[in-house]
Amino acid sequence: MSEAGEGDEFQLRSVQVSDAVQLAFDEWPARGPRIVFLHATGFSRGCWRPHAQRVAARSQPVSLDLRGHGASSKPPAPYRWSLLVDDIVSLLVAEDWSNVLLVGHSVGGATAVQVAARLPERVAALVLVEAVVTPDRPPAAAGAGEAPSPLVERTLRRRARWSSRAEAGRYLRARPPYDSWDAEVFAGWLDSGVIPTDDGGVELSCPPWVEASVFTETRGSTAAQDLAHVSCPTWIARATGDRGLRSTCPPQVAQTIPTASETVIEGSGHFLPLENVSVVVTLLNAALDHMGKASSSDG
């Protein structure tokens, strides 16, 4: 249990979702609809902690580590995006979660789209922030040969070990993309994104080989094919690409989901939710307001 405070009361839990994978997540007390937060490639559940804390008084946030990340299992590669979807579907079914607000950034957003399409009876609303969905590019066949991208090569060369958490924090905070993150977001990520090693040091909780495998499998994503099958109310935050990494969420995403509304954030880039907590919280509250009205009308 974390330190006292309404938004800080969370516990680390884990659930076996397949023979090879156990998913870990921070869970807050139930004070309203369940919100399930899905992070981007290479990050961890702690990235969403400030957002969760700001809506914990009216919801039940669940911030989880995708397979290969944080405290979740790290099975061998490949890390196909379809497996990430299968994990979340299995979690919602195993725990019998319904009336869920699903929130995703980057690969987490793509995963959220596909989970909502597969489980419309359980997912009541979506908030997608810079979801990696490419309607104009057909998915590649599984195992299709392609030379490693510069992104993958850089990822595999990334430094992943330090003598202490403090050293890791200083090293990472001085470098992009972490140098532009909100201070609370960075603190939450450092808490779950860096873990102790047996020799007394620390290392990234998402090994570079896992992150590289997720990047390699991007072209196999079929999330774009599921956009039209999303039936729940959807709020989309899209960056203009004017800051840091370019936007990965084209306008076609909002245009293809029948129930979507889109907010374009000027002067922002792909790491929007990690730099601007308030933008995401505004969308979360809008979704929770809508869910509350829908629940009242049903009753």
Where are these regions (language model features)?
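Alpha/beta-hydrolase fold catalytic core
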Residues: 1-37, 56-59, 97-98, 285-299
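Conserved HGGG/HGGXW glycine-rich cap/lid loop of the alpha/beta-hydrolase fold
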Residues: 24-74
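The conserved beta1-alpha1 loop
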Residues: 38-40, 105, 238
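Active-site loop/oxyanion-hole signature of alpha/beta-hydrolase fold enzymes
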Residues: 50-53, 62, 66-107, 282
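Helix-rich cap/lid subdomain of alpha/beta-hydrolase
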Residues: 138-201
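Conserved serine/cysteine hydrolase catalytic core
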Residues: 184, 194-255
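Catalytic histidine-centered segment of alpha/beta-hydrolase-like enzymes
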Residues: 268-277, 281
